[in-house]
Amino acid sequence: MSQQLFKICLLISVLVGVLGLAQAQQSLDALLDRDIAGLVSTYKSLHAAPELSHFEEKTSAFVAKELRTLGYTVTERLGKYSRPEWKGYGVVGVLKNGAGPTVLVRSDLDALPVEEKTGLPYASKVRTKNDAGQDVAVMHACGHDIHITSLLGTARLLAELKDQWRGTLVLVGQPAEEATDGAKAMLDDGLYNLIPRPDYAIALHDIGDLEAGTLGVTPGFALANATKVDVTVRGIGGHGSRPETTKDPIVLAAQIVLALQTIVSRELGPLDPAVVTVGSIHGGTRANIISDEVKLQLTVRSYKEEVRQKILASIERIAKGTALAAGLPAELAPIVKVSDSEVTTATYNDPALTERLKNVFMKLVGDNKVFPVAPIMASEDFGRFGLEGNQIPTVMFWLGASDPAVLAESRRNGKPVPSLHSPFFAPVPEPTIRTGVKAMTAAVLALMKK
């Protein structure tokens, strides 16, 4: 009799859970039907008015105003940078709803120095001065406008659905993601003293490789760490007709660039992904002058910190060893400078939390619309919110943004769809935003349910 009773209770529990999920999904769909037109309008306004990293003043103020209107306690101007002229434009909105977990949801705010070529009626025409005083075009070419809109849509739904969750909800508008120092700036300015330390931190990122209306998940390492390295190769200059009297830094730089390619192929294990890219090389002023200096700019990427450290040590060894072999005196050895600002940690998705959210998403949009996504060597500073050693479980999931017809044509003709950072990157607004808001809201409800 007791076993029979147990089975009946279990069946009732399952039915109640399924019914509750169905009702919750219907509720989200109904609320989104009401809100979607306004959210798309918000997205188009944001897209047309992008701001560069460290200068997100209007975007930040807009997010703060919207969160206050929804009843969140808002703190503005959060962020402490290495350069005093950069102001902190971080925004934090907090909504307390009784005892329970603290969940942090983050969106980035900044745009890129890219001239938009989408031809859309709401395309950015913004031009501004960058940090170097150069006139540049600005575009939301990485979809942060989608992220902001999804955050605001989620903020509204969760404020209305307070009877379905408990705890403290923290919504973060983070500046300077593209510069990779915005998350650090907010943490250095006391973010985790301002709010309860999160039990979970989650974020989404749109991607052109997936159809709008679909989602992607990556357990474990999802994005790489990144470090900028500057190498100044010095030499002894002279006349181009008398190279024997010089130590040509252009030849040295060429040898160094080629030698750097062996770090990944010959010094690292094949199961440790890494990238060493020389993205910039500048030296000399005219054809008949052998210069005395060449400047290289590198990006170094890996998943593991120990791999990163090994690469950095190898760069210095190769640069200085090449100069020594060429007969340069010690006082003219290359100068290797590892940036302490243009550096960010890897994004590590907590496997258990990723699996939990994947199950939520599969029930929400269907098993056939949630895809595994392989780790990539691009970088994000969202992982910093998990603190060193991944103390706080974090997940960044992928939000499909492309027109299905465009993706289908891409598969047929082999021509890739416009990627993130492309001047042609153009998410399909309505289904992308709808899915982003729905998925993020469902994720928070699952983590904070009563």
PLM regions: where:
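Metal-dependent amide/peptide-bond hydrolase catalytic core
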Residues: V251-K450
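Soluble non-cytosolic domains of exported or imported proteins
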Residues: D33-A37, P50-A61, A141, D145, ...
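Positively charged n-region of N-terminal signal peptides that target proteins for export
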Residues: M1-I8
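Bacterial N-terminal signal peptides
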Residues: I8-G20
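Divalent metal-coordination and catalytic microenvironments
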Residues: L46, G93, V105, H144, ...
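Acidic/His- and Gly-rich active-site-bordering loop/insert found
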Residues: Q25-H140, T149-G153, L157-R166
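Histidine/acidic-residue-rich, glycine-tolerant segments that coordinate divalent metal ions
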Residues: G90, R127-M139, D145-I146, L157-S280, ...
